[in-house]
C-alpha cells in the first residue's frame, strides 16, 4: 500500500527519579510518500511525570528519513525504580493518519520494600507495628517521609509520619514507631491494604 507510515524508531529511554531530563525520540517514515505536517504528542496518565511541552510540530518527513523530537520532562521523586510511566507517543500528519507508539522508559530510583514486620495483628487488637524496610532500587533514598494510612473503618493509625533521612541501595531500616488498631469486625484471614 502506498502512503506514509511514521513510527518511533529510538529504543528505551532513561530517566532518573527526581530529575529534569529531555526525552529525545527519533521518528522514522517507513512509508513510500512524504508525511506532511507531522505532529508528535507525548502523553501519560502517571502522576509521577510532568510533561513540559507535550505537543511538537515536526514538519515534513521524507520516505526513509528520520526526524528527532525533544520532549522536556520532569520525573518526580515519587517515581520508584522501574516505575511504569505508561508513556504514549501519538503521531499524526496532514492526511489524517494517526500512529500510536508505546514509549519504553527505564526509571532509575529508590524502591522501598517491606522486608519483614512484627506485631500482633488480629481482629480487635491495638499493636506497636515494627517494619523492616529495604531499598531494593538503583538509587539512594533521601529526605522521605513514611506514613501508614488507615483503611475504611477496619484499620486505624495512631502514629505520625516518620522521616527517613537517607537509605542507600541494599540497606535496611527498622521502624518501630507505628501504633495501629484493628477493628473487631475484621474477619480472620482478610487481606487489607495499608
Residue ranges and their predicted role:
Residues 27-31, 132-137:
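Asparagine-centered strand-capping/turn motif at beta-strand->loop junctions
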Amino acid at each position: 500500500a502506498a502512503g506514509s507510515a511514521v513510527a518511533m524508531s529510538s529504543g528505551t529511554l532513561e530517566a532518573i527519579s527526581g530529575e529534569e531530563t529531555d526525552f529525545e525520540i527519533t521518528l522514522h517514515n517507513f512509508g513510500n510518500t512524504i508525511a506532511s505536517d507531522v505532529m508528535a504528542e507525548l502523553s501519560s496518565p502517571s502522576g509521577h511525570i510532568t510533561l513540559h511541552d507535550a505537543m511538537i510540530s515536526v514538519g515534513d518527513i521524507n520516505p526513509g528519513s528520520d526526524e528527532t523530537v525533544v520532549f522536556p520532562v520532569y520525573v518526580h521523586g515519587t517515581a520508584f525504580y522501574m516505575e511504569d510511566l505508561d508513556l504514549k507517543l501519538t503521531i499524526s500528519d496532514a492526511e489524517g493518519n494517526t500512529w500510536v507508539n508505546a514509549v519504553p522508559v527505564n526509571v532509575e530510583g529508590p524502591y522501598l520494600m517491606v522486608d519483614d514486620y512484627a506485631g500482633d495483628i488480629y481482629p480487635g487488637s491495638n499493636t506497636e507495628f515494627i517494619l523492616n524496610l529495604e531499598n531494593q532500587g538503583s538509587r539512594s533514598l533521601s529526605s522521605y517521609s513514611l506514613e501508614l494510612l488507615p483503611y475504611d473503618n477496619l484499620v486505624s493509625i495512631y502514629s505520625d509520619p516518620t522521616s527517613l533521612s537517607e537509605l542507600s541501595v541494599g540497606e535496611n531500616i527498622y521502624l518501630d514507631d507505628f501504633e495501629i488498631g484493628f477493628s473487631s469486625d475484621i474477619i480472620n484471614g482478610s487481606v487489607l491494604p495499608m
